[in-house]
Amino acid sequence: MLVPTVIEQTARGERAYDIYSRLLKDRIIMLSGDVNDQMANSIIAQLLFLDAQDNTKDIYMYINSPGGVITSGMAIVDTMNFIKSPVSTIATGMAASMASIILAEGEKGKRFALPHATVLIHQPLGGAQGQATEIQIAAEEILKTRKMINEILAKDSGQDIETIKRDTERDHYMTAQEAKDYGLIDNIMVNQNK
């Protein structure tokens, strides 16, 4: 992937940044693509860096992701909750599966979606093979994970656990307005000048 470069004029001359580094200067983190260990490590490092710089200012996390590995996503969520800086989450395009959990775990009152963003919640996906005992262990683990995810969604949305269980039984797609009504986000971002 080609990463754009931006040129800034400073008192000392010109300085070139890749676009993500320039956005980071403004406390903006881009979470895009599949959630995996490599991406999570990058997001966590950025969160820790910005929090160490100034833990009184908001961090803005723009999310456009189909989701991914639950443990990687939960590492991001745990870091968001660990640092002192408030983390504002903004869905752009798609916040699906694990990415919808990250979106909902943003600072209350600071969880947003752009008007045409889509949010998807569902139960964890997994598979198992091997001996019967190994399959049973994997099944028990995914049920524990499902319970944890449902509890997080209930806490973040204000929906009761039975509603969450029902709605995550299958893919549950939501528009930005539906995600707001459901309680996963607090507002829809629109340009007030247009």
Swiss-Prot record:
A Pfam family matched by this chain, by name? Answer: CLP_protease
Instruction: Indicate the residues that form the catalytic site.
Output: S97, H122
Q: Is Protease one of the keywords UniProt gives this record?
A: yes
List UniProt keywords, sorted A-Z: Cytoplasm, Hydrolase, Protease, Serine protease
User: What broad class describes the main subcellular location of this protein?
Assistant: cytoplasm
According to the UniProt entry, its GO molecular function terms are: ATP-dependent peptidase activity; ATPase binding; serine-type endopeptidase activity
Q: Which PROSITE patterns match?
A: CLP_PROTEASE_HIS (PS00382)
Indicate where this protein resides in the cell: Cytoplasm
Keyword Cytoplasm on entry = yes
State the coiled-coil residue ranges.
none
Q: Which reaction does it catalyse?
A: Hydrolysis of proteins to small peptides in the presence of ATP and magnesium. alpha-casein is the usual test substrate. In the absence of ATP, only oligopeptides shorter than five residues are hydrolyzed (such as succinyl-Leu-Tyr-|-NHMec, and Leu-Tyr-Leu-|-Tyr-Trp, in which cleavage of the -Tyr-|-Leu- and -Tyr-|-Trp bonds also occurs)
Q: Which InterPro entries match?
A: ClpP (IPR001907), ClpP/crotonase-like_dom_sf (IPR029045), ClpP/TepA (IPR023562), ClpP_His_AS (IPR033135)
On the tree of life, the source organism's domain of life is Bacteria
Task: State any GO BP term from the record.
Answer: protein quality control for misfolded or incompletely synthesized proteins
Q: GO terms for CC?
A: cytoplasm; endopeptidase Clp complex
**Broad EC category:** hydrolase
E.C. numbers: 3.4.21.92
Q: Which family does it belong to?
A: Belongs to the peptidase S14 family.
* Quaternary structure annotation from Swiss-Prot or TrEMBL: Fourteen ClpP subunits assemble into 2 heptameric rings which stack back to back to give a disk-like structure with a central cavity, resembling the structure of eukaryotic proteasomes.
NCBIfam families xrefs: PRK00277.1, PRK12553.1
Q: What does this protein do?
A: Cleaves peptides in various proteins in a process that requires ATP hydrolysis. Has a chymotrypsin-like activity. Plays a major role in the degradation of misfolded proteins.
**What is this protein's name?**
ATP-dependent Clp protease proteolytic subunit
